């Protein structure tokens, strides 16, 4: 039986060392997926309706633990993408409410600015400070919240707006109780209150999470 006949009708032989090495090399060259990927739930109406507002649940319960004892960096970002005949960004008010159950008494600190996709600052600083376009407030019922109005652009009527906003929050575990090796925070849900024209389009959301690698990252304010 010729080699071609063997390939056509014969049984497949065992993979050679060379083919195994090639397969391993090919697998190693494939792009690695993100270390941690959080599924995003479709927006749904919640039990917190308010007149003139749209409440949406943008995530499922999420538990984060610090394996190095330093802290956890939580990055929440969302993209508002809508179109309308006369929609102004100044007519949009967003309120993000983070519902958190800590495993112990800790502190929150904002590590990065809240910026639009083209780099314009929306909010920055400490969670308890006022911002140019927004403010962090302690919320006894939910944890803490960010309230801001989208920046205004003169003469931008009759256009499609697409901006992304991100909030990077650092959970500082300095206040962890003695003997606690892996403190954690549970993000019960992230809510967004959107107040805009009824014809405003959908709100698409993305939640990403990353752990802090170095203690220096905790000092970024």
From Swiss-Prot:
Disulfide bonds: none annotated. Signal peptide: none annotated. It comes from the Viruses. The keyword RNA-binding applies. GO terms for molecular function: RNA binding. Residues 1-24 are annotated as: Disordered. GO terms for cellular component: ribonucleoprotein complex; T=3 icosahedral viral capsid; viral nucleocapsid. Keywords: Acetylation, Capsid protein, Ribonucleoprotein, RNA-binding, T=3 icosahedral capsid protein, Viral nucleoprotein, Virion. It is found in: Virion. Transmembrane segments: none annotated. The modification N-acetylserine is found at residue 2. Belongs to the alphamovirus/ilarvirus capsid protein family. Capsid protein. Binds to the to the 3' end of the nonpolyadenylated viral RNA and is involved in viral RNA translation initiation. Probably binds RNA and plays a role in packaging. This is Capsid protein. The lineage of its organism: Viruses, Riboviria, Orthornavirae, Kitrinoviricota, Alsuviricetes.
């Amino acid at each position: 039986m010729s080699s071609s006949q063997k390939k056509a009708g014969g049984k497949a032989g065992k993979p050679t060392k060379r083919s195994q090495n090639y397969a391993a090399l090919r697998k190693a060259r494939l792009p690695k997926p993100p270390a941690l990927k959080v599924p995003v739930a479709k927006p749904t109406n919640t039990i917190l309706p308010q007149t003139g507002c749209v409440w949406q649940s943008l995530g499922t319960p999420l538990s984060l633990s610090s394996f190095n004892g330093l802290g956890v960096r939580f990055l929440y970002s969302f993209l508002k993408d809508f179109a309308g005949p006369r929609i102004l960004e100044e007519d949009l008010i967003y309120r993000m409410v983070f519902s958190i159950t800590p495993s112990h008494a800790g502190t929150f600190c904002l590590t990065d600015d809240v910026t639009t996709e083209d780099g314009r600052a929306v909010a920055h600083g400490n969670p308890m400070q006022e911002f140019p376009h927004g403010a962090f407030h302690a919320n006894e019922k939910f944890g803490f919240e960010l309230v801001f109005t989208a920046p205004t652009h003169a003469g931008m009527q009759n256009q499609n707006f697409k901006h992304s906003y991100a909030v990077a929050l650092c959970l500082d575990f300095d206040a962890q109780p003695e003997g606690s090796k892996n403190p954690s925070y549970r993000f019960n849900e992230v809510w967004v209150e959107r107040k805009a024209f009824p014809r405003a389009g959908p709100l698409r959301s993305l939640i990403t999470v990353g752990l802090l690698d170095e203690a220096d990252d905790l000092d970024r304010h």
